[in-house]
Amino acid sequence: MSRYSYQSLLDWLYGGVDPSFAGNGGPDCAAFLSWQQRLLESVVVLTLALLEILVALRHILRQTKEDGRGSPGSQPEQVTQRPEEGKESLSKNLLLVALCLTFGVEVGFKFATKTVIYLLNPCHLVTMMHIFLLACPPCRGAIVVFKLQMHMLNGALLALLFPVVNTRLLPFELEIYYIQHVMLYVVPIYLLWKGGAYTPEPLSSFRWALLSTGLMFFYHFSVLQILGLVTEVNLNNMLCPAISDPFYGPWYRIWASGHQTLMTMTHGKLVILFSYMAGPLCKYLLDLLRLPAKKID
């Protein structure tokens, strides 16, 4: 008989989820909404999410074809690297090491507390995307991931503004929570400053923002909700609202669908604007702090 049976595997995945903590899971959390309301919300949101994905993909593919055709005789755009871009910079390697250490400690906490299932939450998935972007050389796949994750950062803002930390009891577990969510902003801003292949869509274009919105809602109302109902684990608050949710109540998912659509569509644009303004501002401050050169006779 195998040492790790099916039951022990399930215990390893979510056996440490304690339903006595508010908003963590359990039968009461799973029954927070009636099945009729949950089904109706899921059908409506999943339908809208699929429409958003299809519309966004249609416009993205059309734009890709137009860019590929270009002027007569032109060649499709290729992802090229300048010689200096091919070399891994020290700052990029340090950021990759810091992110891997932070996420590695977080994964260790999940194993130690038998809550590995929480690694399916969006913030952890975006962290994995950032590790991929820092480790992988620029290519078409990396550019797609970069443009998608730019509009998946609103979860980090919510986690910082309305933290759910009542289950983080191990030493330094709380600190890792904040460090990881701050790093979710550091990596994309660094890649924007680095430039090169990692160029966001124009501020006036919302194709990738719409695609990210559709993918996020589809993931929440399909994968996370189904797994949450089966395991009675409140994955990213799909079963019941968080204790810090300002819209706590039976309609919290309707409110969340509205404000998260707005945030997903606009938050990434604000991050891009901030990166554009922060670069010249930092350069200006450094110039002010720089000591004047001594005149040599």
From Swiss-Prot:
The chain crosses the membrane at residues 40-60, 93-113, 116-136, 142-162, 172-192, 210-230, 262-282. Residues 65-85 are annotated as: Disordered. Signal peptide: none annotated. It catalyses: 1-(1Z-octadecenyl)-sn-glycero-3-phosphoethanolamine + 1-octadecanoyl-2-(5Z,8Z,11Z,14Z-eicosatetraenoyl)-sn-glycero-3-phosphocholine = 1-(1Z-octadecenyl)-2-(5Z,8Z,11Z,14Z- eicosatetraenoyl)-sn-glycero-3-phosphoethanolamine + 1-octadecanoyl-sn-glycero-3-phosphocholine. Residues 72-81 have a biased composition (Polar residues). Its main location: membrane. Keywords: Membrane, Transmembrane, Transmembrane helix. The keyword Transmembrane applies. It is found in: Membrane. One of its GO terms (cellular component) is membrane. InterPro entries: TMEM164 (IPR026508). It is a multi-pass membrane protein. The keyword Transcription does not apply. GO terms for biological process: positive regulation of ferroptosis. Belongs to the TMEM164 family. Positive regulator of ferroptosis. This is Transmembrane protein 164. It comes from Homo sapiens (Human).
